[in-house]
């Protein structure tokens, strides 16, 4: 019985930590508005488009998509935020005496990217239509950085107007024209990191379409707009930002549900075991209970007598289970987010739940013991 209670505590503690992890991840503010965004992927290069033709296609497609009823704004980028992918690049800061090579996340973004994703502008400006396309021989291309980039590499200095070079495999040079708010980049779990945004060119792209209605309802209109320009261009990975985030939490949700199921099952078995044990004890000690009542014990005294046994067993199992949980939950550390393996709130909640269930399991045997007739009990063999 003690082992059953201990295992229930162990299972419920793990389940509690995993459920709290899931809730913490779902409540994260990723730094942009994830609601009402339709995502779809295009790769014109598969149909023989070069970079220049891709840019022309995108410039024609954007106003067509914005003309769809219910569409608020449209943009595109090399990859979507929270895609699970990791894109980084190296660069140097012009004017640094040591000419240090730095590293940052980077994302090529199209017109109205920050407005569509609702990433707040903190200083300077975001990309303008004049930034698409820039002349190939333009010495300094515009760049927008996030707040963490400015904080990491420029400290308390003004980042606007600063120049960086050697960006990407082409070693391009950029002038910082704006600073925007921090966003989660790869996943909800990923830490905020320095991020560099540059104007997107042609080639493969993810389109982000913000709507005032259910994003799924405009999919036929989006397909029609694309096919009107080129009916041989396929759309890939049609999705909504919300659904994409929900799917990214599939593992956490599955583990939380399974652990909750097994935790609840172990608690139920412990409850049944405690009830069965106390029922057996009441039957076995019926004569003793009758003697106690004949000697003046009140029903409330009998109630306390039986409940005390159940609580003692539960407490012993709970203490053993708590020590086991403290030792075992540290192996869950890699699965947790926003909660420590030894989180006191979780352990207190589990102990409270066990106490309530234990009292409920003690109730029926205790009630039966209170109703024992002393005269019948004294003749009980």
Where are these regions (language model features)?
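Small-residue-rich transmembrane alpha-helices
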Residues: 20, 308-370
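Mid-to-C-terminal secondary-structure elements
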Residues: 59-251, 257-260
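Hydrophobic alpha-helical transmembrane segments of multi-pass inner-membrane transport and secretion
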Residues: 1-21, 253-287, 315-316, 356-360
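Conserved G/P- and acidic residue-centered "switch" motifs that form tight phosphate/ATP-binding loops
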Residues: 124, 146, 296, 321, ...
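N-terminal membrane-entry
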Residues: 249-266, 308, 312, 344-349
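Membrane-proximal juxtamembrane linkers immediately C-terminal to transmembrane helices
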Residues: 23-43, 67, 120, 190-191, ...
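Intracellular coupling helices
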Residues: 272-313, 371-379
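Alpha-helical transmembrane segments
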Residues: 7-36, 279, 331-341, 366, ...
